[in-house]
Amino acid sequence: MSSQDLPPRTLPSQESEPLYGGRRPGRVTVRDIAAAKARGEKWAMLTAYDALTAGIFDEAGIPVLLVGDSAGNVVFGYETTIPVTVDHLIPLTAAVVRGTRRAMVVADLPFGSYQASPGEALHAAARFMKEAGAHAVKLEGGQRVAPHVEELVGAGVPVMGHVGLTPQSVHALGGFRVQGRGSEAGDRLLHDAKALEAAGAFAVVLEGIPSELGARITQTLAIPTIGIGAGPDCDAQVLVWQDMAGLSARSPKFAKRYADVAATLRDAATEFAADVAAGAFPTEQYSYR
C-alpha cells in the first residue's frame, strides 16, 4: 500500500486540519492530540498487540493505539493485568510500531514497573522507547504518581495518565467496580486528574466512572480526556479491540460490539476442518506442480 492509499492524518505543522483529515501522512503527535481538543474534535483509541491487527487499525484511521497491559487478559490469558511485565509488553509494542505508519503508539507501564519511584518509572519508560520504539507511555494513578509523571515528562517522555477504575489496583478497589460515585469520591478523582495535568501529562484516561463526573473532569481539564466507561462527553473513547470486535467471550457494559469476529473465526475454522476431513482441501487450485 502506498502512502497515497493511507487515510490522511494531521502533522504538527497542520494543526488547523482535523485529526482525521490532514493532507499528508505522518505520525500523530501529542501536539495533534492537543489541537483536536481545542477544535472540539472527538477521536477514537483502540488497543493493539500485534503488527497485523495494528496495521488494520492504522488503515482504518485510528489515530492512537494503546499496547495495554490488558494483554494479560486477552493475549496471555491471565485473570488480571497484575502478572504482566515489561518484558511481556516490549515485543508486543515493537510489533505494533512496526505494523503502523500513522498512529501514535502508547505503551502501558505494567504493575510493579514504576510505582516504587520516579526513577524506576523512567527506567521502564526508557526501555519502551529505546527497545520498542513507543511514542508515549501510560501509567495508572493520580496524585501519588504525579512526581513520576513529572520525572518522565522532564526527561522527554510523553505521558498519558489513567484514573478512576485502575485495573492494576483491582484488589485494593475490591474488584472491578465503578469509581467516583458521590461528591467526595468525585472530588478526589477530579483532584487526581488535575494533578496529572499539572505534572505534564498530555492526556488522561477516565475509566469506570459516572457520566456526569466524566463530563465534569473533561470540562475542567485543558488536556484531552479518554473515556472507557466514563460517558459520552469525554474528548475521546477507547476500547479493548477484542471487546469492540466481538472476539471476547465476555465484555463489560461499556463495550459496544461492532462485529462478531468470534463467530466468523469459529465458522471459518469449522469449515476448514470439515473440508480437510472430507478430502475437499487442498484442491488442485491450492497445490503446486
Name each model-derived stretch.
Residues 2-259, 263-289:
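Alpha/beta enzyme core
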